[in-house]
Each structure stands twice: as structure tokens, then as C-alpha cells.
Amino acid sequence: MIAMMQIDIGGRAIEYRVIPGPVSERPPLVFLHEGLGCAALWRDFPDKVARDIGVPALVYSRFGYGHSAGLERPRTPRYLHEEALDVLPALLDRLGIAQPLLIGQSDGASIALIHAASGARPVAGIVAMAPHV
């Protein structure tokens, strides 16, 4: 079993795990899970990718998933925007992650695209698997 940590974002806990890697000019990876998933469902895929590329990575569970805090209210049609524009930037700031390569599946891919399209902070790139477009 892979040990997860928790970090406070806006007064609520988010489950996460940092996969260590060498200091590199290459961007760190951030894995964004699908709509019915959580960090644990990525299994060892992030570890293998980070190791093969030689970079650190972040895997986390959004609010309401895995061992992160539950939702405070029912989701609205803008929940992907809230994750992309509020929660993800706060998490990246707290963990000191700048200009990541975002890797998202389904909801996670949509969050990555919305986050990057906002232009609020630079990303190194996006791998978007089955986004809602």
C-alpha cells in the first residue's frame, strides 16, 4: 500500500502523494483522476511514468473522493471550473509546484484544460485523456 499524506486547502483536507524525482529542468507531473476515481486508482502508473521520465510527480484526490474531505455542498454544473480555477491552484501553491505538466483522465482532463485555458498560471503542457469537450 502506498502511503498518502493530507494537506489543508481552504480549511479542508486533501489526500495527496508526492513521488520524488531528481531536480530537473523538466516539469513535474500532476495526475488528475477521473470522475469516479481517486488517487489510489492510478495505482503505480504515476510512479512508473515519473521514474521513466526522471521527474517528480503529484497524485491527489479531489474533495469528495478517496480520503479527501467530503463535499460541502452539492456539485453545480461549474464544479470542474471550481476545481480548475480554485482548488488546483491552491494545492499547487501550497506544495510549491510551478509550471507542471498536467495529466488528466475524463473529469481530470477537463480540469487540466480549464486550468490551462484560464491563463492564470503557466503550465508546461497537458495530456488530456477523454476530456468533456
Identify what each model region corresponds to.
Residues 10, 36, 78-82:
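Conserved phosphate-coordination/catalytic loops
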Residues 12-70:
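Conserved HGGG/HGGXW glycine-rich cap/lid loop of the alpha/beta-hydrolase fold
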Residues 43, 89, 113-117:
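Short, hydrophobic alpha-helix immediately C-terminal to the catalytic nucleophile
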Residues 11, 25, 55, 93-99, ...:
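Active-site acidic short loop of glycosyltransferases
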Residues 53, 59-101:
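Active-site loop/oxyanion-hole signature of alpha/beta-hydrolase fold enzymes
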Residues 45-50, 74-77, 119-120:
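Glycine-rich, phosphate-binding/catalytic loops in enzymes
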Residues 98-133:
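Conserved hydrolase catalytic core segment
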Residues 1-13:
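N-terminal cap/lid segment of alpha/beta-hydrolase-fold proteins
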